[in-house]
Amino acid sequence: MNLYEYLLEGVRHFTLIDPDKSVDYLKIAKYALEAGTDGILIGGSLGIRESQIAQVVKDIKNISNVPVVLFPGSLTQLTDLADGVLFLSVLNSLDPYFIIGAQIQGAVLIAKHYPRLEVISTAYIIVGDGGAAGFVSMSKPIPYTRPDIAAAYALAANYIGFKAVYLEAGSGASQPVPPEMVRAVRRAFPRVLIVGGGIKSGEIARAIARERPNVIVTGTLAEESPEKLGEIVRAIKQA
């Protein structure tokens, strides 16, 4: 089974580890694995070198039996030690660089230097607060109250041919992506749907999981309260 097929199966939980924030990333990974996470995302918006990414991926794969996937915030965040990469295009950025400019450069880098990476083309749609990702990518986040706009972006992503849509409320967001927005996007997009940002309790995770996204991501929670990961994972599995 390749990574894309793995992502399509059911509703999975992935833990996002940002090496720029997480000095003790192995401790977080161990907590996540013990909690039953289905995969690890590695990446961040700022300050990560290629050598740092490679070492983090190598270390985590040494203790993990789940996919380790790159979630790159820049062109330096690539390594073929990972199982795959979310090849992100920030659809609601106001700067063409984050929609297609960086992707042109990244595509050449992957083809030349990381050909073993499984590439998952991903429409990255930033909503609500947007967090650091929204600020860095100069995005115009979709309001929480407009699931119809999010669905329109997802429909465009479907017609363009993206393999995945990632609804992002932002790192440490005050609110998660609302379930009704997840529902609207799920109806518009038939392939892999990923939801992340602001998911801080089992109750929230369960409400989102009931709308049948393929992946629910927690990051800040894993950094600040890793002992709560078990509650989140159980809620997703029981939804």
Curated annotation (Swiss-Prot):
PANTHER family: HEPTAPRENYLGLYCERYL PHOSPHATE SYNTHASE, PTHR40029. Prenyltransferase that catalyzes the transfer of the geranylgeranyl moiety of geranylgeranyl diphosphate (GGPP) to the C3 hydroxyl of sn-glycerol-1-phosphate (G1P). This reaction is the first ether-bond-formation step in the biosynthesis of archaeal membrane lipids. This is Geranylgeranylglyceryl phosphate synthase. Its cofactor is Mg(2+). It catalyses: sn-glycerol 1-phosphate + (2E,6E,10E)-geranylgeranyl diphosphate = sn-3-O-(geranylgeranyl)glycerol 1-phosphate + diphosphate. GO terms for molecular function: imidazoleglycerol-phosphate synthase activity; magnesium ion binding; phosphoglycerol geranylgeranyltransferase activity. Mg(2+) binds at D18, S45. One of its GO terms (biological process) is glycerophospholipid biosynthetic process. The keyword Cell membrane does not apply. Its EC number is 2.5.1.41. Keywords: Cytoplasm, Lipid biosynthesis, Lipid metabolism, Magnesium, Metal-binding, Phospholipid biosynthesis, Phospholipid metabolism, Transferase. It comes from Pyrobaculum aerophilum (strain ATCC 51768 / DSM 7523 / JCM 9630 / CIP 104966 / NBRC 100827 / IM2). InterPro entries: GGGP/HepGP_synthase_I (IPR039074), GGGP/HepGP_synthase_sf (IPR038597), GGGP_HepGP_synthase (IPR008205), GGGP_synth (IPR010946). Transmembrane segments: none annotated. It is found in: Cytoplasm. Belongs to the GGGP/HepGP synthase family. Group II subfamily. It is an enzyme of class 2 (transferase). GO terms for cellular component: cytoplasm.
